[in-house]
Amino acid sequence: MASHKHPGSPGWTGPICQDMAGTTPKASAPRPDLPRPGPEDHLEAQGSPSSNSSMTTRELQEYWRAQKCCWKHVKLLFEIASARIEERKVSKFVMYQIVVIQTGSFDSNKAVLERRYSDFETLQKKLLKTFREEIEDVVFPKKHLIGNFTEEMISERKLALKEYLSVLYAIRCVRRSREFIDFLTRPELKEAFGCLRAGQYTKALDILMRVVPLQEKLTAHCPVLLVPALCAMLVCHRDLDRPAEAFAVGERALQCLQAREGHRYYAPLLDAMARLAYLLGKDFVSLQKRLEESQLRKPALRGFTLKELTVQEYLS
């Protein structure tokens, strides 16, 4: 696989949520923006509008009001709803069903996902590398050599894993880390983008519509992290001849890119939205104008289309 150690890829170890004005998409495969582990203050500062933003004072005020609203209300509750034993040719393991619900209001988009004990164990090892001091008092369920498939052990581990996730989520720098968000969303996102590359748009959409609400809740502190998945949904809807649905999800993506004109998805998204607007009889002139202004600020020898950009995500 080509290198993805650059801003905008999960392999990048520099600051996240920064202006991408100095980056140009390469043919190599960048993975989507994911948060770098670190203090919350740093993440919030990097999520600020860029210095070269063309937003008016009123737009900036509305931007910050929306951001504060997101930060204030998103709180998640974790449950291990069930467990099942899965047997394969050379292995046998327990799959735990995790249910994630937003508290404080009725959540019609509760997330349901499955992870095995080894996935939790991998998460713990990764977190220890970056947050050893922060999680030194967090109890991780021990591994047992025998008895892992007894009803008593599974019930005991379900409770322990629920407590483990809840305690991790209570630590701000951990819940906003790349490792924690990856644990809860990456397998599903990787599958969805694989379906997109294979032209299986209906299946890709089905997966994205289940995982994106969770990703949105986990990345409320930095909405730009949601952009690759939203753009993938746009591409799927568009290629399934659903221009209205594609345009609607594109508007969400543009909202996430407020004050982020230098982001690598900004120009390709505007181009796709202008074409959809023309097709739907909507105002496409203003979108074209924004695209032209963006291209003047950041000239590119060859611009990538939105589809060319999205199919490069989650290649490893």
From Swiss-Prot:
Query: GO BP, one example?
Result: protein transport
Specify the superkingdom: Eukaryota
Q: How does it sit in the membrane?
A: Peripheral membrane protein
One of this protein's Pfam families, by short name? PX
Give the sites modified to Phosphoserine. S3
Which residue range or ranges hold the PX domain? 74-191
Query: In Gene Ontology terms, what is one molecular function of this protein?
Result: phosphatidylinositol-4,5-bisphosphate binding
Q: Name it.
A: Sorting nexin-20
Q: Which organism is it from?
A: Bos taurus
